[in-house]
Amino acid sequence: MNTLLQRINISTTKAPELIDITDQVEEVVAASQIRDGVAIVYSKHTTAAIKINENEPLLLQDMAHFLEKCAPRNGNYLHNDFTIRKNMPDDECPNGHAHCQHLLLGTSESIPIISG
């Protein structure tokens, strides 16, 4: 079985930010010359998620509102209480809401590759 590991770097400017990476994934698959298999798209960050859905502007707004309702940015998260947290990185930010939102979404999608 042929395998390929390719990194796609995505920069964000706000939270939440819903970014369509379809073109980048399709380019990697095409360049790989793998005709049949599975593309696994994965985010290694604990506050970034991978989901397949429709890229329709009003739906994207609905999704952002849904995430905010489920885990509001201004909610009370122990993760954000830096007076009680231990072993934090120097650049830590109060992002408990983003970790909780991530629980709803997940880190990866498996996409079948059929005939390229």
Regions found by a protein language model. Give the residues of each.
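Active-site histidine-anchored catalytic micro-motif
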Residues: M1-G116
